[in-house]
Amino acid sequence: MYDDLIEQCHLSMERKSKLVDKALNKLESTIGQSRLSYLPPEIMRNII
């Protein structure tokens, strides 16, 4: 029972990580030379 729950949680976190990565890639392409481009990736991930 716990193994299934852990597996589902792991899959959910992987999907979330992929979505955040896609969003970051889109943001990076649209941000360009704005001030947001100076933020470290960790902060951008927290914002998303």
Curated annotation (Swiss-Prot):
A Pfam family that the UniProt record links to this protein: PRANC
Protein's name in the database: Uncharacterized protein VACWR005
Additional record remark: Encodes the C-terminal region of the G3R protein of variola virus.
UniProt xrefs under InterPro entries: PRANC_domain
Top-level taxon: Viruses
Family under the similarity heading: Belongs to the orthopoxviruses G3R protein family.
